[in-house]
Amino acid sequence: MQPRASSDFWARYRELPANIRGRADKQFALMKDNPQHPSLQFKQLGDRRGQEIWSARVTLKHRALAIKRRDAFLWFWIGDHETYDLMIS
């Protein structure tokens, strides 16, 4: 399944510190090779408005969110765990 990212995702990505962007790059590369790798904690959170929402760990304090499409995951958000918790609750 091909990953894609929204313009909002890239805007948030560019706002992250360089070390977090580097970690995100490593995690997304790992996801392409092995989406089931335990360090990703890649999981479906549920359905919202008929769309599957998925989460992946970037660091202990950062997460990324995607919507599953037929042939791809569309990554739409990346950021700190506190904001992530608010978004998924």
Predicted regions and their residues:
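Enriched for short, Lys/Arg-rich terminal
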Residues: Q2-S7, A11, E15, R57-S89
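Secondary-structure boundary motif
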Residues: E15-A18, D33
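A short, surface-exposed loop/turn module that caps and links secondary-structure elements
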Residues: L30-A56
